[in-house]
Swiss-Prot record:
Keywords: Ribonucleoprotein, Ribosomal protein. One of its GO terms (cellular component) is small ribosomal subunit. This is Small ribosomal subunit protein bS16. The keyword RNA-binding does not apply. The lineage of its organism: Bacteria, Pseudomonadati, Acidobacteriota, Terriglobia, Terriglobales. PROSITE patterns: RIBOSOMAL_S16 (PS00732). It comes from Koribacter versatilis (strain Ellin345).
C-alpha cells in the first residue's frame, strides 16, 4: 500500500521535510517512489510546496495521506482554474 507522508531532511535541530510517495512498510527516510513536495517548518509561517496534480494522481491510484500531510494539503490553496 502506498502512503503520502513526510521524509525528514536537514541537520540536527534544523528539520526540513520532503513530501513523498512511499510504500507503507518502508522506513521513514527510505527509498521513495516520487517526491511530490517540500515542507519547511522553520519559516514563519511554514513554507509548503506541493505538486497538487501529482498528489491527486497518486490518491486516485489508492495512495493514503498521513494525518500531517492531510493537514498540510488543507492549508495550501488550490491553484486557480485557468480562464479560457
Amino acid at each position: 500500500m502506498l502512503m503520502i507522508r513526510l521524509s525528514r531532511r536537514g541537520a540536527r535541530k534544523q528539520p526540513h521535510y520532503r513530501i513523498v510517495v512511499i510504500e507503507k512498510d518502508r522506513a521513514r527516510d527510505g527509498r521513495s517512489v516520487e517526491v511530490v513536495g517540500t515542507y519547511n517548518p522553520r519559516t514563519n509561517p511554514g513554507s509548503i510546496e506541493l505538486k497538487r496534480e501529482r498528489v491527486e494522481y497518486w490518491v486516485s491510484k489508492g495512495a493514503q495521506m498521513s494525518d500531517r500531510v492531510k493537514k498540510l494539503w488543507d492549508k495550501t490553496p488550490a491553484a486557480p482554474a485557468s480562464v479560457a
